[in-house]
Amino acid sequence: MPRKGHVTKRAVLADPVYNSKLVTKLINHLMIDGKRAKASSILYDAFNIVQDKTGKEPLDVFEEAMNNVMPVLEVRARRIGGSNYQIPVEVRPERRTTLGLRWLVSYARLRNEHTMDERLANEIIDASNNTGSAVKKREDVHRMAEANRAFAHYRF
C-alpha cells in the first residue's frame, strides 16, 4: 500500500482486431510471464473456433458468456462479536468483469481439450449457453450469498 496517496488505474487500450477493451482485459488474464503475443494468438484462434462452431460473431458470443459468468452478489467475511459472518454484498462493476474473466480463464485451463485455444473456445461457448464450470462457479457464489441473506443487515 503506497503511503503517498491513491494510485490511479491506467486505462486499458481497446484491442486492435475487435476494438474492445473487454478483449484486451481477457488477453491480459490469459498472459503468462508477459507473453502478450502468445496470449493474443491463443485468444484469436479461440475466437475463430467459436465462429466455426456457432456460426455467430465471436465477440457477441463472448459478451453473452461474460454476462452469464459475472456475479451480481458475493459474500465477504466480517468479524462481529467474536465470530465471523459471511455477509452478502453487491459486486462493483469493475470487480464483476475481473471475476468473470478470472473464472473463465481459470476454468478453461482446467478443461481436457488438447490445446488452450480449444479449451478457451469451448468454455466461452458453454458459458454463452449458461453451462460450464465458470457459470457453475457464479451459481455457487450466488447460492452462498442467498444462504447468508440473514446477515445482510450488518452491511459492510
UniProtKB/Swiss-Prot annotation:
GO CC annotation terms, alphabetical: small ribosomal subunit
CDD domains on file: uS7_Bacteria (cd14869)
InterPro entries from the UniProt entry: Ribosomal_uS7, Ribosomal_uS7_bac/org-type, Ribosomal_uS7_CS, Ribosomal_uS7_dom, Ribosomal_uS7_dom_sf
Pfam families noted in UniProt: Ribosomal_S7 (PF00177)
GO terms of biological process kind: translation
UniProt keyword annotations, A-Z: Ribonucleoprotein, Ribosomal protein, RNA-binding, rRNA-binding, tRNA-binding
GO molecular function, one term: rRNA binding
Subunit structure: Part of the 30S ribosomal subunit. Contacts proteins S9 and S11.
Membership in a protein family: Belongs to the universal ribosomal protein uS7 family.
HAMAP family: Ribosomal_uS7_B
Function, as annotated: One of the primary rRNA binding proteins, it binds directly to 16S rRNA where it nucleates assembly of the head domain of the 30S subunit. Is located at the subunit interface close to the decoding center, probably blocks exit of the E-site tRNA.
Protein name: Small ribosomal subunit protein uS7
Organism of derivation: Lactobacillus helveticus (strain DPC 4571)
